[in-house]
Amino acid sequence: EAFSNAGKYGMIEAMKQRELLDFLHALECLKTNGRHSVTCGGVTESVAAHSWRLSVMALLLLPEFPEIDGDKLIRMCLIHDFGEAITGDIPSFLKTDANEATETDAIGSLTGTLPEPQRGMLRALFAEMDAMQTKEARLYKALDKMEAVIQHNESDISTWIPLEYELNLTYAAENAAEFPYLKELRTMMAEDTRQKIAKAKEEQA
């Protein structure tokens, strides 16, 4: 029932097959568009890979948050980086207000190619995510940032840039603080970061 294609989102009409294919083609580059992180195998992480594992995180954590709309949360996680199909990924520590505006325009362009009710459903989700007024939006944002830190903890430390030694200890902490489970998880992640840094220093000594 949580993943029904009807109900509150009104998705009771099928997209025309060509509309579906065209939209999927527009998103295909997310499979190869790189992010700032490098995986444990030495491969540049893709935007799609980040969104996939973020969605898995959200799915696994649903029992911890019975008060939230889990369907909406997972939808947010799945779509949140659609704009990067046009803009590419920009690391958080480099992203400007102008970059944010460009990504918003990109989302508008992409969703504008969809028919209703799909267009309206996606645009409503993006508006809710941007407003950060609902618990679902704030939880998605916390998980989004935390997944990035988890990936950095998994990457070879030689791929880190200098500012990340501090950033990986603090990034997402403010977002996680609202949710006791995530606050504890973020503390555990920071300890993993400290241990990773300490191990690297020992190996260099």
Say what each PLM segment does.
Residues 3-205:
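Alpha-helical, largely C-terminal catalytic domains
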